């Protein structure tokens, strides 16, 4: 068997390291814009998700509260596009969680909110939160 020259071995190792580390940065940040995934989660997804949870727990909602919930649901829906933008998405699992589970769930949620149907809203919200766990299980590192 012919021996593989050292330069080629070294080059392969560097290439593999490069691919692995760029996949990691891709998850944490897009390719051109400064926003990190962590910032979007903390600044947008988590607060809107919490407001929906609180709002739906309150059950009997007034018009003003429904209107606020619609804002939250619409922002989560828009987030399903942000998470796919700027080359942030690393694989099919991410794509399914963002552009299917989160997007479809939040669209359903918005419909339920517009028709002020609390039961439908609760069930759509549970779809929305399935996207969090699906994506986190694969792509969010264990607690630091
Ligand atoms: C398509 C993937 C994806 C989806 C969907 C997703 N997340 Fe995340 N989330 C991540 C990744 C990746 C991180 C880790 C970011 C890092 O630490 O670099 C994260 C981190 C977080 C964090 C921790 C942020 C911090 O300050 O460290 C919170 C909170 C969070 N997500 C909430 C949610 C909630 C709530 C949902 C569902 C409504 C959700 N996420 C849906 C990918 C996703």
Ranges and model annotations:
Residues 1-9:
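Positively charged n-region of N-terminal signal peptides that target proteins for export
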Residues 5, 21-24:
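Intrinsically disordered/low-complexity terminal segments and short unstructured peptides
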Residues 9-19:
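Bacterial N-terminal signal peptides
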Residues 24-127, 144:
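Extracytoplasmic c-type cytochrome modules immediately beyond a signal peptide or single-pass transmembrane anchor
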Residues 128-139:
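The canonical Cys-X-X-Cys-His
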């Amino acid at each position: 068997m012919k021996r593989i020259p050292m330069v080629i071995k070294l080059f392969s190792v560097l290439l593999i390291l490069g691919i692995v580390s760029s996949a990691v940065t891709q998850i944490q940040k897009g390719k051109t814009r400064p926003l990190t995934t962590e910032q979007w989660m903390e600044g947008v997804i988590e607060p809107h998700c919490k407001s929906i949870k609180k709002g739906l727990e309150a059950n009997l909602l007034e018009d003003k509260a429904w209107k606020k919930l619609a804002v939250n649901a619409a922002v989560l829906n828009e987030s399903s596009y942000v998470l796919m933008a700027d080359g942030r998405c690393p694989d099919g699992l991410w794509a399914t969680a963002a552009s299917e589970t989160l997007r479809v769930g939040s669209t359903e949620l918005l419909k339920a909110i517009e028709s002020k149907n609390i039961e439908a809203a609760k069930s759509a919200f549970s779809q929305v939160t399935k996207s969090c766990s699906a994506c986190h299980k694969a792509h969010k590192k264990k607690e630091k």
